[in-house]
Amino acid sequence: MNLAGFEVGLDKPFFLIAGTCVVESEQMTIDTAGRLKEICATLGVPFIYKSSYDKANRSSGKSFRGLGMDEGLRILAEVKRQLNVPVLTDVHEIDEIAPVAAVVDVLQTPAFLCRQTDFIRACAQSGKPVNIKKGQFLAPHDMKNVIDKARDAARDAGLSEDRFMACERGVSFGYNNLVSDMRSLAIMRETGAPVVFDATHSVQLPGGQGTSSGGQREFVPVLARAALATGVAGLFMETHPNPAEAKSDGPNAVPLGRMAALLETLVTLDRAVKRVPFLENDFN
């Protein structure tokens, strides 16, 4: 699959989707994207910058949602113009898809909306690649139905069916907790879509702080290593220059100052894993 100008797959180096949870300001967005570009260029990691113009599913109605679609998209367009990097953002409403697709290179669907057929179809018919997040409530084998909906919609519109990714971001484990079952990555590979592992939302503690979600960022390296050892096409990680001051999802964000060291470790692991065959199918 060609994604934003580079090939992705289990026979290719992992690509990285990374950035701040939400667009907080133009300068911070440009600075963060610029630093991530430098790190990824040094390590040879294909990179897509990610940030949200609107966090439509915050725990509290009083929480910061973003700068609004117009301003958020303007800033993301500046990232593309100034830094020449592809950008990704998530959409929450069907009527937002067209204006967002006019700016970004990749769309993302929120995990909560993975079962909304009309929404998935509309995203699939945008003409853009789509990173489809698996719901925290969904079994991994049920992602085949979601990917099939997207492919059917693309085919109906005369578009390529080879533009969808399946993204794992943890599964609900009781209240205010998520766990990651690495078997799900192998199961989701059976869809034929490139699999992405979201290493930061997987350590989120949803609603764990009452009016906001908590998180355990110390486990991001653990789960990222496990995902690469299992075999994935890409990683998703949110980061922030100062997570303690982040306006959304700070507790599970990787400090920007630690991204280089983390990615260096992950690149070494990914190269080692992809030099040897995956034997899962030989055990059936």
From Swiss-Prot:
Superkingdom of the organism of origin: Bacteria
Q: In which pathway does it act?
A: Carbohydrate biosynthesis; 3-deoxy-D-manno-octulosonate biosynthesis; 3-deoxy-D-manno-octulosonate from D-ribulose 5-phosphate: step 2/3; Bacterial outer membrane biogenesis; lipopolysaccharide biosynthesis
Protein's cellular compartments: Cytoplasm
Catalysed reactions, as listed in the record = D-arabinose 5-phosphate + phosphoenolpyruvate + H2O = 3-deoxy-alpha-D-manno-2-octulosonate-8-phosphate + phosphate
* GO molecular function terms attached to this record: 3-deoxy-8-phosphooctulonate synthase activity
Biological process (GO) annotations held by this record are:
keto-3-deoxy-D-manno-octulosonic acid biosynthetic process
Q: What is any one of the record's Gene Ontology cellular component terms? A: cytoplasm
Enzyme nomenclature, EC number: 2.5.1.55
Keyword field: Cytoplasm, Lipopolysaccharide biosynthesis, Transferase
User: Keyword Hydrolase on this protein?
Assistant: no
| UniProt keyword Transferase present | yes
Which Gene3D superfamilies does the record match to this protein? Aldolase class I
Q: What NCBIfam families has UniProt attached to this entry?
A: KDO8P_synth, PRK05198.1
Q: Which PANTHER family match?
A: PHOSPHO-2-DEHYDRO-3-DEOXYHEPTONATE ALDOLASE (PTHR21057)
The entry assigns this protein to a family as follows: Belongs to the KdsA family.
The protein here is known as 2-dehydro-3-deoxyphosphooctonate aldolase
Its taxonomic placement starts with: Bacteria, Pseudomonadati, Pseudomonadota, Betaproteobacteria, Burkholderiales
